[in-house]
């Protein structure tokens, strides 16, 4: 019995070793888009849906959307995980946490991810891709929080920065895309082959 116990302990991985992910792939990491977004309701007061809808695209990529009953623009946000850091892209349209609990929601997702992957992240970066109200509304909820960096006025050193953000083996390319804002940015994630355009590109209606 003692020998079996010793073998079990010796085989237990150290924190942060088990979930180390190789973010280099020949093809895009698969993701799940089989779900439906909340459509809001005629009466915002009577709406009983969650304030922020969270969808797990894959094990290291999450999509968040603000409830249309809370704000008519219903902006999207994205939470990306690497082996050392996490990145929240955009911060929604509402400042008040009682109506739009962005920090609380993101913290819960991060906690579950850390527990599942046996990793304690070094830092969480919040990066709006522009300065529109629908991108920066919830920024204040993250200010002054330990291990959180808010990059509200992030300036690109060059037009295309291929080493702009390294989340721990998941390296994102940042592209300057001025349009609605002079400091507009787009992020390309080679691991998922997703281009996060924020307000710089919308499908026509």
Q: Would you name each region that the model predicts?
A:
Residues 51-115, 186-200:
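Conserved beta-strand hairpin/beta-sheet module of binuclear metal-dependent hydrolase folds
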Residues 159-189, 194-195:
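Core dinuclear metal-dependent hydrolase active-site scaffold
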Residues 24-28, 94-173:
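Active-site HxH/HxHxD metal-binding segment of metal-dependent hydrolases
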Residues 35, 57-64, 167-170:
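Short Pro/Gly-enriched beta-strand edge/turn motifs at strand-loop
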